[in-house]
């Protein structure tokens, strides 16, 4: 007899439960009505990384964010005549900022404050405070859409579409 080396597959029959290698629990950080997002939010549903799991109605909060952006825009527009007279060297960068300001996009970073006089003037008019209020609200607005951190399968769903979701509530 001749012996030959070959690969023999090893099969191990096993019974038991699988435990996910990566598992996260979903909690709401905002309150609102759970809206449809294209896929049913049910156990067994597959999601790709970055795909929307849950959309919470943000219409009211969005209106507040837009109002804050408008207030920031108006505050900057109100100081433009003073900038033209008292700070002609920085007027153009603020004019460019206003021209590029779009209420339907993320608020752009404020121009760099180059001198102490400019810094005191801009800060004294509440521009910096308004800017950070808007940025804070934009960050919170993003929490109305909960996205899958990685590809996987939903194993638990504790809310249904159309129900009220409360801040801190476990979703799945």
Q: Where on the chain are the PLM-derived regions?
A:
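Active-site-adjacent helical/loop segments in soluble small-molecule enzymes
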Residues: 16
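Periplasmic scaffold and linker elements that assemble and bridge Gram-negative envelope complexes
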Residues: 1-6, 19, 31, 35-36, ...
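Conserved phosphate/oxyanion-binding catalytic-loop motifs
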Residues: 28
């Amino acid at each position: 007899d001749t012996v030959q080396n070959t690969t023999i597959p090893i099969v191990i029959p096993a019974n038991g439960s699988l435990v996910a290698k990566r598992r996260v629990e979903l909690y709401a950080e905002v309150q609102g009505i759970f809206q449809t997002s294209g896929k049913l939010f049910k156990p067994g549903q597959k999601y790709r990384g970055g795909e929307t799991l849950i959309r919470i109605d943000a219409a009211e909060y969005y209106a507040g964010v837009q109002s804050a952006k408008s207030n920031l825009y108006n505050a900057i527009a109100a100081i433009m005549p003073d900038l033209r007279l008292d700070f002609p060297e920085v007027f153009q960068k603020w004019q460019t900022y206003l021209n590029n300001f779009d209420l339907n996009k993320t608020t752009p970073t404020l121009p760099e404050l180059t001198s102490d006089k400019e810094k005191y003037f801009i800060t004294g008019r509440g521009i910096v405070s308004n800017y950070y209020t808007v940025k804070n609200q934009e960050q919170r607005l993003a929490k109305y859409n909960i996205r899958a951190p990685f590809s996987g399968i939903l194993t638990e769903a504790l809310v249904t579409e159309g129900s009220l979701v409360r801040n801190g509530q476990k979703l799945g």
